[in-house]
A protein has these predicted regions:
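Terminal and linker regions of secretory-pathway proteins
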Residues: 1-310
């Protein structure tokens, strides 16, 4: 049996809050330290779980900071700081990692899916010479603008899904946000746009009303007067993306014996699986289990590859 902690991070996302508004102004490094402090406090109050193997996990942007959080925890363990968290490893899914990989492989991925033509792909290779992050000439900039325009026509999070309304309310102003910190009311401020039932975002739409329901909040133990309205994505949070790459943290952790599970959906163009495979190869690990199919119920379910440090 496994126990799972679902954490709203960074502070001021989800149902988390800060007594001082400055506490919401964080970035990759500071938010990761916040998570470490939370875990230290949680294990201090629940010492019966300290002996359990502990794994961190996160998808998408959370996948970028998970190795950093794991590094902070491992450093605390090496210094024998209490509580001693029994960290064994981490898992990340479709993780944002490094723009040199994540952005560059969008072009190759779009070509593989047939979203851009051979001619556009060849023009991109010729004029950008493999650098699709910051165009170095006008011809490269123009072809990348064409690529981005074509990708914008689809749901790049899953290229087989229809493009739907993103079920997130419009950003609220600072005055309204401050008012939320003082109110006990859970009356929704502004419902998100309603997608059609066949859209994958319809679940996000329903979640907005479910999470703002009083029975749900009571069941979750949400403290009254803290967060008046739950919003799935708070785009207006003052978050600084100050860690350029998480690759050094992946390398450091795995070389020190921590286990890592990196998984990636093959229809994601926001973080293409090609980019994930590329940065993993850059770690120069030896392959211990060749690329193969694994089966579930007699059907090929996926094609995993296992690696280990040299």
């Amino acid at each position: 049996m496994a126990s799972i902690i679902f954490l709203d991070s960074p502070v001021c996302s989800g149902f988390s809050y800060a007594r001082d508004p400055k506490g919401c102004d964080v970035g990759d490094y500071s938010s990761s330290l916040q998570v470490q402090r939370f875990l230290n406090k949680w294990f201090t109050h629940h010492p019966q779980y300290l002996s359990n193997p502990f794994y961190l996990g996160g998808d998408s942007y959370a996948g970028k900071v998970i190795p950093l959080i794991a590094t902070y925890i491992s450093q605390g363990t090496e210094k024998r700081e209490q509580p001693l968290i029994n960290l064994k490893g981490y898992l990340v899914g479709n993780p944002i990692t490094d723009p040199k990989f994540d952005r560059n492989f969008r072009v190759q991925g779009a070509h593989g899916f047939g979203i851009i033509s051979d001619q556009i792909y060849e023009a991109a290779m010729k004029n950008c010479k493999g650098n699709y992050v910051i165009p170095e000439n006008q011809l490269c900039a123009e072809v990348l603008e064409t690529v981005d325009s074509l990708i914008s026509e689809i749901a790049d999070g899953h290229v087989l899904y229809k493009k739907c309304v993103v079920a997130t309310p419009k950003p609220i102003d600072d005055a309204t946000r401050r008012k939320f910190l003082l109110e006990e009311s859970i009356k929704p401020n502004e419902a998100p746009g309603r997608p059609t039932v066949d859209c994958f975002t319809y679940g996000y739409y329903l979640a907005y009303f479910w999470m703002n329901n009083k029975m749900t909040r009571d069941a979750l133990g949400i403290k009254g007067g803290t967060v008046s309205e739950w919003v799935r994505c708070k785009k207006e949070l003052p978050y600084t993306q100050d860690m350029p790459s998480s690759i050094p943290y992946h390398l450091n952790l795995t070389k020190r014996g921590y286990r890592a599970l990196v998984y990636s959906g093959d229809h994601d163009l926001q973080v293409p699986h090609l980019s994930t495979q590329a940065w993993i190869r850059s770690l120069n690990f030896s392959i211990v289990d060749d690329w193969r199919a694994w089966h579930l119920g007699g059907q090929a379910a996926d094609l995993p590859s296992h690696m280990r440090t040299i």
